[in-house]
Amino acid sequence: MDSKHVTESTSGQEDIQKTWWKEAIIYQIYPRSFQDSDGDGIGDLNGITSRLDYIQSLGVDIIWLNPIFLSPNDDNGYDISDYREIMREFGTMEDFDRLLKEIHKREMRLVLDLVVNHTSDEHPWFEEARKSRHNPYYNYYHWWPAEKGEPPLRLSYFDEEGNAWMYNKSTDSYYLHYFSRKQPDLNWENPEVRQEIFDMMRFWFDKGIDGFRMDSISLIAKDPSFPLIDSKKYPDIFSFYAKEPRLHLYLHEMNRQVLSKYDCMSVGEGSAVMVDDVAKFVDPAREELNMLYHFDAARIRNTTLPDNPESGIDYSLIALKKMFTEWDKAVDKGWPSIYLGNHDQPRMVSRFGSDKDEFRALSAKMLITFLLTMRGTPYWFAGDEIGMRNIRFDRIEDYNDIDTINRYKKAKAEGKDPQAVLDEQKETGRDLSLIHI
């Protein structure tokens, strides 16, 4: 792999810098369902190591692992209780070191998931924070004192009641959680929090990893005053949840203190980042991130629900082409990420092709060809290369995903038809793509 920077010119774009992560193919692995090495039914690090020759044979340059850190697994490992320990069912630090060594031996690279919008409520920081308002870790998180009354409305992705505030008796205050109740949001306003995160990143870079995929990174900056939201005056209410102006200051600080010190790759998950904003994240002159991936592709669906705009945009080739063209242009001097599916999305064959037996293989080849021939760095999800399709569940009891389960509970609590949730989740649920390979 050549990490030299060479200037090249492309149509309409000058001074694009060549580097290894622009010329790479990224293969995403959800460890739990990839390869089990010890017969306990759970994929693990040694299982991944045993499959490296296969992965290399695909032409893969970079492996991205979903979270492998210690976690109670309320949200598939995205609730981290220790950033410097390996999830026990995945193996040990020695297993990780062996995996990393074997990846590099094959001239591939390794990218880890960085989850720093929130921690687990079982992380030592939060266990201390929730004891007392006077605890030094209290300000590691966002709180609303009960004496100020009910907190201003903020919605949660995974809370069964939809409320992003949860009362904590010992501090007589509410903590913020944009995701589940067991995922309290970190307070990036606190410089001590930022330094803890930067130190943790250095720990993994010093071990030899090659980059981070940054989960929900657009959500880390909040206005700590939590103003009331007037949806009539401010139709883009998500600006109150994310993209707060300090976000770019934090990312630049991260780049200056950590990323710029290593030959590494950084890609951010751009929840609610609009096409007009993407250049702010990836313009090399701004020194923030290398790449950012967006969610507009996820809104184009083969199946949409009537009278439900959240269910997406009806699929058409024109809609898909228009969306990718807009994002490619908006990236400008930055570099695009190209993907059609991941751990949060249904299988690309089921969404953008046909998963019927007679068309499944053809669809998979067509979509992989698209990924590999677009300008940008392609990401594919393990199993796409064999045309894996969605599994479809008929009962809520079949689901493990907290998002699906809480959507179902919320619908029942509000007197809505829970079957409508099941019908939607058969097409869009996160569990659909996470079955064992």
Indicate residue ranges for each PLM-predicted region.
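Active-site and adjacent substrate-binding regions of carbohydrate-active enzymes
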Residues: 1-435
